[in-house]
């Protein structure tokens, strides 16, 4: 992000980083992953605070999506996958393009010009249950 700062100052650009509910929820056995994702949220919030005066918005998407990694996990541990899926209020993992992508497009657009430093949970409502 620091390397892009001079260009972003000129263009008043948007930064969209990706985090994970693993850090927010504290999933067991995921300490290293959760720490890395929370570091992304932390540095993003600092950048939002420091760079807002330059017209740069910095936000974070925390998705729960049907990614290739999730599909591999579903094949390896179908019972656990189904247990997690069944607890998502909307009943499914998000579609990468239709669900997650549209939020990213919104955050990159002028329609989100007054949103910065926020973590947008795109997880079918699963985090609200914890």
Segments predicted by a language model, with ranges:
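Residue(s) in the substrate-gating loop at a strand-loop-helix junction
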Residues: 20
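C-terminal helical subdomain
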Residues: 53, 60-61, 79-111, 115, ...
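Conserved Rossmann-fold SDR core element
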Residues: 41-44, 51-67, 71, 115-122
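Amphipathic alpha-helical dimer-interface segment in Rossmann-like NAD(P)H-dependent oxidoreductases
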Residues: 1-10, 48-49, 109
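Short C-terminal tail/terminal secondary-structure segment
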Residues: 25, 116-130
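Short-chain dehydrogenase/reductase
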Residues: 29-38, 94
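Active-site helix of classical SDR
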Residues: 1, 36, 44
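Active-site loop immediately N-terminal to the catalytic Tyr-X3-Lys motif
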Residues: 12, 25-31, 53-54, 91, ...
């Amino acid at each position: 992000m620091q390397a892009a700062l001079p260009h972003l100052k000129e263009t008043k650009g948007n930064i969209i980083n990706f985090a994970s509910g693993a850090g927010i929820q504290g999933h067991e056995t995921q300490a290293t992953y959760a720490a890395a994702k929370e570091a992304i949220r932390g540095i993003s919030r600092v950048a939002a605070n420091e760079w807002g005066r330059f017209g740069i918005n910095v936000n974070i998407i925390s998705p729960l999506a049907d990614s290739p990694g999730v599909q591999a996990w579903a094949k390896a541990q179908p019972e656990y996958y189904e247990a997690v899926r069944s607890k998502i209020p909307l009943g499914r993992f998000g579609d990468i393009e239709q669900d997650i992508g549209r939020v990213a497009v919104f955050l990159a657009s002028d329609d989100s010009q007054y949103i910065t430093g926020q973590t947008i949970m795109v997880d079918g409502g699963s985090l609200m249950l914890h």
